[in-house]
From Swiss-Prot:
Belongs to the class-II aminoacyl-tRNA synthetase family. ProS type 3 subfamily. InterPro entries: aa-tRNA-synt_IIb, aa-tRNA-synth_II, aa-tRNA-synth_II/BPL/LPL, Anticodon-bd, Anticodon-bd_dom_sf, Pro-tRNA-ligase_IIa, Pro-tRNA-ligase_IIa_arc-type, Pro-tRNA_synth_II. GO terms for biological process: prolyl-tRNA aminoacylation. Catalyzes the attachment of proline to tRNA(Pro) in a two-step reaction: proline is first activated by ATP to form Pro-AMP and then transferred to the acceptor end of tRNA(Pro). Its EC number is 6.1.1.15. It is found in: Cytoplasm. It comes from the Archaea. One of its GO terms (molecular function) is ATP binding. This is Proline--tRNA ligase. Keywords: Aminoacyl-tRNA synthetase, ATP-binding, Cytoplasm, Ligase, Nucleotide-binding, Protein biosynthesis.
Length: 461
């Protein structure tokens, strides 16, 4: 089955997302999918909270004159903005944009709050819906007109040095987040022609899907003083002078959820990382006539023990065990525990891992420790397996000549022969938009790989 078909099918079968809402590019998180989203963003929230970020919530509506204040910024997506033009039947004097992103909203308010150097640093974030009128082919959780889960952080600092340190911290936070959901990434400094509008530079996190295409799943932007000058975000320095704040912003969206679905899944269904699984353990009683009660009591006992640490579900439906196994494999539950009369007699339990199908018989009295050990290995194994997959999608080609046309043909041939990311040793003379136009692919930017600097190239979503 082609990846595209598998992806669309698993979103429905596993109860993740329903795209039948009557607006293109808008869908509904189903309860199971919403829990994956919730647990994922809880990890991200904790990482931000632990580094002194404060969560907040800003309005969705942005006045046209405020959005237009940052000219270079709005040029990056002015054709994608949704506009509110009426209140009821009455035309509005000033059109209101549905939030495409929140720089203009947040920086207008930061100006009200930041007066002196002691007000800095200010590190805010929110998780909100954003809207873009995507004209390309929309795909659930990948390319949406309503992005339902956009975590955007915005910071302001008194010095350029503090601003640069914040960029490093943001990259570390995102690195830890993607490790937690077992997603390997390639980090690139985006080229000048593809950086965030209004930024000094952009760092981006990309991963590779099973079809070999690359997807951007996180960005970190150094804004310098560009937005601060536009919004007159000034503060009084320790020596009594005035200066503009130095700013950063960084975002992660529903694409993080799409990535963990796509990268870990297999022909049976989802394979969910431990920490974001709505159900971490499913208990399945194996019932035999005349011994139902003893099995049910044991299942209840184990469930009570396991629920002290994990999210547990007992599947007591009156259907065959094989059907239950299949259902929970589709949903990607990390661990299945089976208990039958013989297991009870022997003081055992059978545990089955979703990531590799390994079946183990363990001592029932020690079930909590056995599960903990299994989960530690599961998490490490899932990240290692995903990393090995990503490495197979990386091709390094030598650049012994500086001829633009010859190199572009070499890159195009490499892309036709292998999916994923092509790495070309960096040469300043070929790192430009003209080169990108010749290769029928995207230049992701400058990437450090095995200690060397490369131009990274890929076909993208």
């Amino acid at each position: 089955m082609e990846f595209s078909e598998w992806y669309s099918e698993i979103l429905e079968k596993a109860g993740i997302y329903d795209l039948r809402y009557p607006i293109k590019g808008c869908g509904v998180y189903l309860p199971y999918g919403f829990k994956i989203r919730r647990y994922s963003f809880e990890i991200l929230r904790k990482l931000l909270d632990d580094t002194n970020h404060d969560e907040t919530l800003f309005p969705m509506l942005i006045p046209e004159n405020l959005l237009a204040k940052e000219g270079e910024h709005i040029k990056g997506f002015e054709d994608e903005v949704y506009w509110v033009t009426h209140g009821g039947k009455s035309p509005l004097e000033i059109k209101l944009a549905l939030r495409p992103t929140s720089e203009t909203t947040m920086y207008y308010m930061m100006k009200q709050w930041i007066k002196v150097h002691t007000d800095l640093p200010m590190k805010l974030y929110q998780v909100v819906n954003t809207f873009r009128y995507e004209t390309k082919h929309t795909r659930p959780l990948i390319r949406l007109r309503e992005i339902m889960s956009f975590k955007e952080a915005h910071t302001a600092h008194s010095t350029q040095d503090d601003c640069n340190k914040q960029i490093k911290e943001a990259i570390e936070i995102y690195g830890k987040f993607f490790d937690e959901i077992c997603i390997p990434v390639i980090i690139s400094k985006r080229p000048e022609w593809d950086k965030f509008p209004g930024a000094d530079y952009t760092m981006a996190f990309d991963t590779i899907f099973p079809d070999g295409k690359t997807m951007q799943i996180g960005t970190v932007h150094n804004l310098g003083q560009n937005f601060a000058k536009t919004f007159e975000l000034e503060f009084e320095t320790p020596d009594g002078n005035k200066d503009y704040a130095y700013q950063t912003c960084y975002g992660i969206s529903d694409r993080a959820i799409a990535s963990l679905i796509a990268i870990h899944g297999d022909e049976k269904g989802l394979v969910i990382p431990i920490d974001v699984a709505p159900i971490q353990i499913v208990l399945i009683p194996l019932l035999f006539k005349g011994k139902e009660e003893i099995v049910i009591e044991k299942i209840k006992e184990l469930s009570k023990i396991l629920k002290t640490k994990y999210r547990v579900h007992v599947d007591d439906r009156d259907i065959r065990p094989g059907r239950k196994y299949n259902d929970w494999e589709i949903k990607g539950v990390p661990l299945r525990i089976e208990i039958g009369p013989r297991d009870i007699e022997e003081g055992k339990a059978v545990i089955v891992r979703r990531d590799n199908g390994q079946k183990m018989t363990v001592e029932a009295f020690n079930i909590l420790n056995e599960v903990e050990k299994t989960f530690e290995d599961y998490k490490a194994s899932l990240l290692q397996k995903a990393t090995e997959k990503l490495e197979k999608y990386i091709t390094v080609i030598e650049n012994d000549k500086k001829d633009l046309l010859l190199l572009s043909e070499k890159v195009k041939f490499a892309l036709s022969e292998s999916k994923g990311i092509i790495l070309v040793p960096y040469i300043e003379s070929i790192y430009n938009e003209e080169f990108e136009g010749l290769i029928d692919a995207s230049v992701l930017g400058l990437t450090t790989y095995n200690g060397k600097e490369y131009i990274s190239i890929a076909r993208t979503y």
